[in-house]
């Protein structure tokens, strides 16, 4: 193929003109906006999360046959209660109660229409997530650490890996429930950095 120098030069100049003179600078808005979950009257988000998590934990312990009436159960129940209170404190201090409430609502909806898969990843170390039905693994029974998921001294955000069999069906269900101005698919911008940073 023969090239005409003027044609090549003209193509380069036009590409430069398009790239630097016609395209605007664009910086994506990287502000994190957590979901805004409406809680029932008489509650703030922290109190409502505590109520739901406590009720969920009570149901789980009851199903396991752990009651205050059995002497052996008392210390184990105490361990569960201490862990739940610690996690709720960290979640509230970090301002993530509405995130957990939103994930519970999504989990409840996916279970209702049989789209749910297991919650996975480091969120399985959260007793709050287990008590809310977001994950199906008992973190105390299996020795999983909440601190691998969320810590009070960290700056990262909680990330609950929640798989569903048909994400587009779930999106449509949530739009019907919450409105199309509040439900949008999102994408990740993956970056690599050292874990210690």
Feature map (PLM): residue ranges:
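Phosphodiester-processing cores and adjacent nucleic acid-binding clamps
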Residues: 1-197
């Amino acid at each position: 193929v023969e090239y005409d120098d003027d044609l090549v030069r003209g193509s380069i100049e036009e590409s430069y003109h398009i790239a630097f003179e016609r395209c605007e600078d664009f910086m994506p808005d990287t502000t994190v906006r957590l979901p805004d979950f409406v809680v029932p009257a008489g509650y703030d988000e922290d109190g409502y999360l505590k109520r739901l998590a406590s009720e969920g934990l009570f149901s789980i312990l009851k199903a396991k046959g752990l009651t205050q009436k059995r002497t052996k159960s008392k210390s184990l129940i105490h361990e569960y209660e201490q862990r739940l209170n610690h996690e709720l404190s960290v979640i509230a201090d970090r301002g993530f109660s509405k995130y957990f409430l939103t994930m519970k609502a999504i989990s409840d909806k996916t279970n209702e229409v049989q789209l749910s898969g297991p919650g996975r990843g480091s969120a399985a170390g959260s007793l709050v997530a287990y008590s809310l039905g977001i994950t199906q693994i008992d973190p105390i029974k299996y020795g999983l650490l909440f601190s691998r998921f969320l810590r009070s001294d960290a700056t990262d955000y909680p990330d609950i890996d929640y798989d569903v069999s048909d994400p587009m069906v779930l999106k449509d269900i949530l739009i019907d429930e919450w409105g199309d101005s509040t439900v949008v698919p999102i994408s990740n911008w993956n970056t690599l950095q050292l874990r210690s940073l």
